Amino acid sequence: MSNFSPREIVSELDRFIIGQKDAKRAVAIALRNRWRRQQLEGQMREEVMPKNILMIGPTGVGKTEISRRLAKLAGAPFVKVEATKFTEVGYVGRDVEQIIRDLVEIAITLVREKRREDVKAKAHLNAEERVLDALVGKTASPATRDSFRKKLRNGEMDDKEIEIEVSDSGASPNFEIPGMPGANIGVLNISDMLGKAMGGRTKTRKTTVKDSYPILINDESDKLLDQDQIVQEALRVSEDEGIVFIDEIDKIAAREGGSGAGVSREGVQRDLLPLVEGTTVATKYGPVKTDHILFITSGAFHVSKPSDLLPELQGRLPIRVELSALTREDFRRILTETEASLIKQYIALMETEEVKLEFSDDAIDALADIAVDLNATVENIGARRLQTVMEKVLDEISFTAPDKAGATFIIDAAYVKEKIGGLAKNTDLSRFIL
């Protein structure tokens, strides 16, 4: 587990997300508290629970991005779900325990990737031997193998086609089993059991020497890994480091005087309660305790209010953070200051066609102005509006770029207004196009 200080976490998030200092501080403290808990011993370590977070703010201001970047920074298993996708237990639809099962699957992938890195050197040597077997046969003399090995390492054999045998991990079909706690168990993994009994199924693949290496390295890595250890480690990582982001929690808040779907909405909240408070969820890999999983919830709360959530659920989300709507200056900074800003992305994309894009300062001002105006007059979708505006401005250049290799386009305020000014003024049209 990474031991970044809260200040380091915030400065890392600043590289990708503009503004929203309060939200960044809240998640930074939550992540640091996890590290602090890991340093504790015995009973006290069990007693310290994570302080779950409720983010309140309009769409497109960075709620999801903050959580996603945080999980990446921590190297923790992260799952994002929308509260509206779930139904009360007993109704048709996904139940909330599926969130934890998805988290475990993601943790297994993470742990396996880390373990593969540890054995990569050994796996690479084994893969090389298998490529040699395919090229010269298993019975070839050591001298022949050595001469071919030299050619292999010099890249002389890269384009030669070979046939390789790789283990067939053909996905066994998964079935939802009604009333079973570990649903999605699959056909009780009969194919897995048979595979182990018969030494594993293999299939033959035809590929070039160069392309065979990644496949064989993965195959050899998996042979060197202990799957049971990976599962145990993944279960531990899910319990101690997992982060669950539940979006649109405001949509399941019962509005005052509401009726109809309110029953199911409240039911989803009641099902979330034990998950957020701490319960044990059955998965096909084993039970997972949710006591120390960090839950970050978010919602715009345009129609409902946080106080419309069940009081018990409100109590389990002790940290409230309000994210502010984006200003014109924020839009300017999003276009220019973030690590992979939209402008940098478009410049890089056009470079692949040998077309050079240059944006003047007044063009950036014009883009920010149009995005702010559209958010105010049409619908406030936050930073996502910039993508729509940029696509419209660069539509012509993107379309004709393959025929304009070597050209340089200078995007200034006049160009932006020419491409988009009329549409932005015509509110009726911009409702549909921007």
Swiss-Prot record:
Keywords: ATP-binding, Chaperone, Cytoplasm, Nucleotide-binding, Stress response
Chain segments annotated as coiled-coil in the UniProt record: none
UniProt-listed CDD domains: RecA-like_HslU
Chief location bin: cytoplasm
Biological processes per GO annotation: protein unfolding; proteolysis involved in protein catabolic process
Alphabetized GO MF terms: ATP binding; ATP hydrolysis activity; peptidase activity; proteasome-activating activity
UniProt keyword Ligase, yes or no: no
UniProt-listed Pfam families: AAA, AAA_2
SMART domains reported for this sequence: AAA, ClpB_D2-small
InterPro entries: AAA+_ATPase, ATP-dep_Clp_protease_ClpX, ATPase_AAA_core, Clp_ATPase_C, HslU, P-loop_NTPase
GO cellular component: HslUV protease complex
Subunit structure, interactors included: A double ring-shaped homohexamer of HslV is capped on each side by a ring-shaped HslU homohexamer. The assembly of the HslU/HslV complex is dependent on binding of ATP.
Function: ATPase subunit of a proteasome-like degradation complex; this subunit has chaperone activity. The binding of ATP and its subsequent hydrolysis by HslU are essential for unfolding of protein substrates subsequently hydrolyzed by HslV. HslU recognizes the N-terminal part of its protein substrates and unfolds these before they are guided to HslV for hydrolysis.
Similarity field: Belongs to the ClpX chaperone family. HslU subfamily.
Protein name per its UniProtKB record: ATP-dependent protease ATPase subunit HslU
Native organism: Brucella suis (strain ATCC 23445 / NCTC 10510)
Gene name of the encoded protein: hslU
